[in-house]
Amino acid sequence: METIIEDCKALDYSWLPQQIEGFTLVVSNESDYTSLLERLTAGEEVLKVPIFHYQNDLGWRWCALYDKEVEDYTVHIEMPLFSFVDISFVRGDLESFWNGLKERCVKGLTNMLIEPSNNFTFTYRRRGIPTWDFSEVMPKELEGFVRDIDPAHGIRMINGSFIVGEYRKMDECSGLLLYYNELRDEYFAELRYKSYPEIDHHLDAKNLDDLANVLREHLGPILKGLNDRVD
């Protein structure tokens, strides 16, 4: 790990844009890398070496890093309620990873989080999800939760899944995630309560008409239930 940290520290970051459509660059500096080396010297386990990330005002992060658990250089998409790996960037060595970032970093971030419709598949479009009028059943704010992802701007993940809706409290990691999985051709939801995931079957649906019905009936009560919890 010492060699990996030193190699990352020596990288040329000058080509990275400071801003990409509302996302600001944050680069690991010498102090950050020194802190990682000190932790290793103290016998601590270091599982990730952050290299740089882009972050917007919603707390969405596009992160380039080394992941010791899989022994790969990779890109993690880190959102307030969920995270996943962009496997298209995974490389086993730093040189090819860095060259891949130079070629596709801006495009990768743009397609993933800024213009996510670029990642919509044929199935996602054929189901009519991007053009569906969700305004009645998915209001911008509900029970103190803010909708910051909607079906017209769904985030493509892995294994055929899209995040088509997210409601969250802006100051805490609680809320609701609405998914569409194109392999199973179904909609379903997960809850987050203080970062802990929970399955909720009230929003299970096979098509947009069914989804509209269950959202109309259950979305408000589900979010109210999260508000009413007492630890």
Regions found by a protein language model. Name each.
Residues 57-100, 170-213:
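Intrinsically disordered, low-complexity regulatory segments enriched in Ser/Thr/Pro
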Residues 100-101, 113-115, 189-190, 214-216, ...:
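Glycine-rich loops and low-complexity Gly/Arg-rich segments
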Residues 34-38, 96-99, 140, 144, ...:
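Polar/charged alpha-helical tracts
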Residues 19, 64-66, 102, 136:
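Short, isolated positions within intrinsically disordered regulatory regions of eukaryotic proteins
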Residues 202-231:
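Long, compositionally biased interface segments
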Residues 94-112:
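Short, structured interface segments
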Residues 105-108, 119-121, 195-196, 220-224:
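Short C-terminal domain-edge/linker segments immediately following a structured domain
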Residues 1-53, 107-172:
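Negatively charged, low-complexity tracts enriched in Asp/Glu with abundant Ser/Thr
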